[in-house]
Amino acid sequence: MQYKLTRVDPNAPNEAYPIGQRELVSDPLLEDQVHKNIYMGKLEEVLNGAINWGRKNSLWPYNFGLSCCYVEMTTAFTAPHDVARFGAEVIRASPRQADFMVIAGTCFIKMAPVIQRLYEQMLEPKWVISMGSCANSGGMYDIYSVVQGVDKFLPVDVYIPGCPPRPEAFLQGLMLLQESIGQERRPLSWVVGDQGIYRAEMPSQKEQRREQRIAVTNLRSPDEV
């Protein structure tokens, strides 16, 4: 059987419907439904979003503490606070199985090399939370034996203020870490060398609530605080 290929002429008259004309109709409602139900972007963006969702909802903490802030951190793992809502109830005894570590307490100079080695044993991706005034800036221990902030030797992702912070503050810091992880862009495969990690710019909670603090007119007495 022989075939003959012919080019379609869009301006040619329609033999089946002589009166009909070809027109491109733009339906805003149809286009809106298409954009809502059909993904028109890059597949990489979908994969990054799905992987970041899994990472931020299955954060396994490394179990160790330095001082009294560790007591408040462990309180957050009890039933009244239910940290399992955030997927962080699986406490690991080995840094090789943990996703993030919480520096809870006073970091002495003798402990700094140990903490740094534990951090290096963690697998990528990994994150660090600095919990309490002593871990953030040395606290009231402005002496030679205390490191004035764990960010002197570790990359800190979230700072939790307080002396010591309440368990609710730890949960808020965990939520901020989840928000930051959701906006990260990491390579989707094993990469040797520089991993090209792009971290999200997290706004300062202090600056965000500055107008709210200034607007307060009725201050509580020291006996009620």
From Swiss-Prot:
Q: What is the reaction catalyzed?
A: a quinone + NADH + 5 H(+)(in) = a quinol + NAD(+) + 4 H(+)(out)
InterPro entries, per this entry? NADH_UbQ_OxRdtase-like_20kDa, NADH_UQ_OxRdtase_20Kd_su
> What EC number is given for this enzyme?
7.1.1.-
Query: Principal place where this protein is found?
Result: membrane
Gene Ontology MF, one: NADH dehydrogenase (ubiquinone) activity
Q: How does it sit in the membrane?
A: Peripheral membrane protein
Q: List the Pfam families hit by this protein, alphabetically.
A: Oxidored_q6 (PF01058)
Residues annotated for [4Fe-4S] cluster binding in this entry = 68-69, 134, 163
The UniProt regions of compositional bias labelled Basic and acidic residues, in chain numbering, are 204-213
Q: Give me the Gene Ontology terms describing cellular component.
A: plasma membrane; respiratory chain complex I
Cellular compartments annotated: Cell inner membrane
Q: Where is this region: Disordered?
A: 202-225
Keyword NAD in annotation = yes
Give the quaternary structure: NDH-1 is composed of 13 different subunits. Subunits NuoB, CD, E, F, and G constitute the peripheral sector of the complex.
NCBIfam families named in the record: nuoB_fam (TIGR01957), PRK06411.1 (NF005012)
Instruction: Report the protein name in the record.
Output: NADH-quinone oxidoreductase subunit B
- Species the sequence originates in: Ectopseudomonas mendocina (strain ymp)
